[in-house]
Amino acid sequence: MSGGEKEMPTNKERSPRYNRILLKLSGEALAGEEGFGIDPKVLDAISLEIGQLVGIGVQVGLVVGGGNLFRGAALQSAGLDRVAGDHMGMLATVMNGLALRDALERSNIRTRLMSAIPMSGVVEHYDHRNANRHLKNGEVVIFCAGTGNPFFTTDSAACLRGIEISADVVLKATKVDGVYNDDPVKNPDAVKYDALTYDEVLEKKLGVMDLTAICLCRDHSMPLRVFDMNKKGALLNLMLGGKEGTLVEAAQ
């Protein structure tokens, strides 16, 4: 289904390691230091990073979360229906997608925004055939509204979209530089993993992604890499053969 990881050194031609990627951005990442809302500086920084990838010929699909605009947990504990809460979360991802598309297009990067929920006149409805055509034409494609169904996380949506568009890898951007055996923020002695198998992630309960997302990647042999998006140039370095974060893939 997927092309898999290719280990290749950086070369003078700056040939990318991957032809097509699915990048998962959390909603919190868009909030920057504010912790809520959308930080224009973050949008500009993300646009710059993605523009560099497009410039070397990488086809980029994006899935964005919505946690910077809506968190359903507190309301659900107060009695909000889970399905209603999940639908509100999906709408938050659409707002983030609109902001991302605007930022990318202001940087002269041709971008499509596709929603799993039909929103005529606002965004294009998701169709994997059209998404593949857009990617082949060199356009960045942002996928929003999750899977379109409640009870599924945006991490699961990212893995699903990555599989559907035959991405070479799913890249999860986080606030830390990979996967650790404990929370590195709380435990300074936490040990980072350079590589893991899907089964090790599940057995060790490392919390890289939810169970559904990890199982999707495992069952379809989709490599997953967790890296620090806040590290300037990390994404481009990954594309050019550098080692960033933690790679999760099938056992060799």
From Swiss-Prot:
GO biological process assignments: 'de novo' CTP biosynthetic process; UDP biosynthetic process
Gene that this sequence comes from: pyrH
Ligand binding (ATP): K24, L25, S26, G27, G67, R71, T174, Y180, D183
Keywords associated with the record: Allosteric enzyme, ATP-binding, Cytoplasm, Kinase, Nucleotide-binding, Pyrimidine biosynthesis, Transferase
Top-rank taxon: Bacteria
Disulphide bonds in the chain: none
Catalytic activities: UMP + ATP = UDP + ADP
Organism (species): Alcanivorax borkumensis (strain ATCC 700651 / DSM 11573 / NCIMB 13689 / SK2)
GO cellular component: cytosol
Family affiliation: Belongs to the UMP kinase family.
Keyword Chloroplast included in the entry's annotation: no
Name of the protein described by the UniProt record: Uridylate kinase
Function: Catalyzes the reversible phosphorylation of UMP to UDP.
NCBIfam families noted in UniProt: pyrH_bact
Compartment list: Cytoplasm
Enzyme Commission code(s) on record: 2.7.4.22
InterPro entries with a match to the protein in the record: AceGlu_kinase-like_sf, Asp/Glu/Uridylate_kinase, Uridylate_kinase, Uridylate_kinase_bac
Activity regulation comment: Allosterically activated by GTP. Inhibited by UTP.
Pathway(s) the chain acts in: Pyrimidine metabolism; CTP biosynthesis via de novo pathway; UDP from UMP (UMPK route): step 1/1
Gene Ontology molecular-function annotations: ATP binding; UMP kinase activity
Subunit relationships: Homohexamer.
Involved in allosteric activation by GTP as annotated region, ranges: 32-37
Keyword presence, ATP-binding: yes
